Amino acid sequence: MNKFATLAVIFCACIVGSCYANYGGQQSYGQRSYGQDSSAASAASSAAAAGAEGQQRYERPVEIIAGGYRGSYAPEILRPIQVSGGYGGERRGYNGGNYRRAGYGPRWTVQPAGATLLYPGQNNYKAYVSPPEYSKVILPIRPAAPVAKLFVPENQYGNQYVSQYSAPRSSGY
């Protein structure tokens, strides 16, 4: 029984070791940044080794930094998004060409700089609109001269003429 258990443990260790053979081994990453995968590097090396014979064309992966100003004052973590392989672009099977299998997540594409969004909100592009800034101008306010001399009853304009042409009033009858 003890020999059987020992052989079973050794057999399972061999199976697990063959599944994860390169897990703890040495890997040559080179100058890689966050978000790149090793299949792109292997595709570049195989395309360079093929030389003029190979018709394979290697396209470099493009990274778009997602995030930025969204109306809040809190800093947001910027993370790179890999355009080439994020939607199954480099996993080309026997169909070849531009066939892409359906993947998860948004379809990120590269938008040319200075492009105008014709239909905003219908794609994954984010339009960055700066808040409006108004210039502050202080205008001098001075009271203007009166346009006309208006009749005000409290001033009693015209009373000086009444006393000249009218008879004096007598208080006793």
UniProtKB/Swiss-Prot annotation:
Its main location: secreted. GO terms for cellular component: egg chorion; extracellular region. Pfam families: Chorion_2. One of its GO terms (molecular function) is structural constituent of egg chorion. GO terms for biological process: chorion-containing eggshell formation. It comes from the Eukaryota. Residues 1-21 form the signal peptide. It is found in: Secreted. Keywords: Secreted, Signal. Belongs to the chorion protein S19 family. Chorion membrane (egg shell) protein; plays a role in protecting the egg from the environment. This is Chorion protein S19.
